[in-house]
């Protein structure tokens, strides 16, 4: 009698934490209920002008996509900063990151920082160090990843778990509010 062995096929997710100076990336693969760390790092743009920085982000993420072949991309949404110019610049970096994914016809999913932190740490207002620590533990890493890479990995983890946490809480809160009205 011959037994067949099937390799478990997971879904590979690229998480992106966009930034004009440093864009973090992290790749995880979800196989069943298990997460496997594939890689992470940062695309650093330097001090060049805006168009060159955006091109560096696009080219860097394009290379990562070609190398690691993710199937889905999870990107952190832009938060509204006190300085509107900073928010607009961050939005442009985010646009370059999303463009890299779209060029490869990948599905792009967006999560707020609160959603990501809630899903990974259990607290939507967690500090950077807490996110780094939980990412390290969840993925079995030997050391904490850099903050930007940790945020990107956290975004990928959030997506791998269906964006649970704040999304579920928000739905519950909406139904409570609608009952009160």
Curated annotation (Swiss-Prot):
Cofactor(s) for this UniProt protein: Mg(2+)
GO cellular component: a single term: cytoplasm
Subcellular location: Cytoplasm
Listed EC numbers: 3.1.21.10
Cofactor remark: Binds 2 Mg(2+) ion per subunit.
Cystine residue pairs: none
Chain residues that bind Mg(2+) 2: 76
Family annotation (InterPro entries): RNaseH-like_sf, RNaseH_sf, X-over_junc_endoDNase_Mg_BS, X-over_junc_endoDNase_RuvC
Keywords associated with the record: Cytoplasm, DNA damage, DNA recombination, DNA repair, DNA-binding, Endonuclease, Hydrolase, Magnesium, Metal-binding, Nuclease
Pfam families named among the record's database cross-references: RuvC
UniProt-listed PROSITE patterns: RUVC
Active site: 17, 76, 148
Major place of residence: cytoplasm
Domain of life: Bacteria
CDD domains for the chain: RuvC
Reaction catalyzed: Endonucleolytic cleavage at a junction such as a reciprocal single-stranded crossover between two homologous DNA duplexes (Holliday junction)
Annotated GO biological process: DNA recombination; DNA repair
Keyword check for Disulfide bond: no
Binding site residues for Mg(2+) 1: 17, 148
Keyword Transmembrane helix among record annotations: no
GO molecular function: crossover junction DNA endonuclease activity; DNA binding; magnesium ion binding
Gene3D superfamilies for this protein: Ribonuclease H-like superfamily/Ribonuclease H
Family note: Belongs to the RuvC family.
Entry protein name: Crossover junction endodeoxyribonuclease RuvC
UniProt gene name: ruvC
């Amino acid at each position: 009698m011959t037994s067949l062995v099937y390799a478990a096929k997971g879904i590979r997710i690229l998480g992106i934490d966009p930034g004009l100076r440093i864009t973090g990336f992290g790749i995880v693969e979800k196989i069943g209920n298990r997460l496997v760390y594939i890689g992470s790092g940062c695309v650093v743009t330097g001090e060049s002008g805006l168009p060159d920085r955006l091109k560096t982000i696009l080219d860097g993420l394009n290379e990562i996509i070609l190398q690691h072949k993710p199937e889905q991309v999870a990107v952190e949404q832009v938060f509204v900063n006190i300085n509107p110019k900073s928010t607009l610049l961050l939005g442009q970096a985010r646009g370059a990151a999303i463009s890299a994914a779209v060029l490869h016809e990948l599905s792009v999913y967006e999560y707020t920082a609160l959603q990501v932190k809630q899903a990974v740490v259990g607290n939507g207002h967690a500090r950077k160090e807490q996110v780094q620590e939980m990412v390290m533990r969840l993925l079995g890493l030997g050391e904490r990843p850099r903050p930007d890479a940790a945020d990107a990995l956290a975004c990928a983890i959030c997506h791998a778990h269906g964006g649970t946490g704040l999304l579920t809480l928000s739905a519950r809160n909406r139904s409570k509010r609608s009952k009160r009205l």
